[in-house]
Curated annotation (Swiss-Prot):
GO terms for molecular function: rRNA binding; structural constituent of ribosome; tRNA binding. InterPro entries: Ribosomal_uL16, Ribosomal_uL16_bact-type, Ribosomal_uL16_CS, Ribosomal_uL16_dom, Ribosomal_uL16_sf. It comes from the Bacteria. It comes from Thermotoga petrophila (strain ATCC BAA-488 / DSM 13995 / JCM 10881 / RKU-1). GO terms for biological process: translation. The gene is rplP. This is Large ribosomal subunit protein uL16.
Amino acid sequence: MLMPRRVKYRKQQRGRMKGKAKGGTFVQFGEWGLKALEPAWITAQQIEACRIAMLRAMKRSGKIWIRIFPDKPYTKKPPESRMGKGKGNVEGWVAVVKPGKILFEVAGVDEETAHEALRYAASKLPIATKVVPRHHIGGEAV
């Protein structure tokens, strides 16, 4: 699973997911990308499930780039514990994703295979996504 090697602070506040993504909104490395259309927390397990699904769809050919990293810890209190007594233990790691963020990129495979691989990855995610080509800005090609 993806997670930071070490962090300055073990626990974080939840924060808010307002607005659109500031960076990472264009396909930079591959030929096709998977773009988020909704805000969400994507867990390390979901990212790994997407990676495996794409590898299977691409039959281990081509290259995959994961453009998000789970760097935010999320905590959970034990079941049936009363309120208070401090913040819960770190349960896992999430990547904060805002609309417009490119999640995954693929290259080295034909268009049909790339679309299929990214569609499989999208089925593992809890948000709406769309497949975008490398040079796609608005409606025109660059």
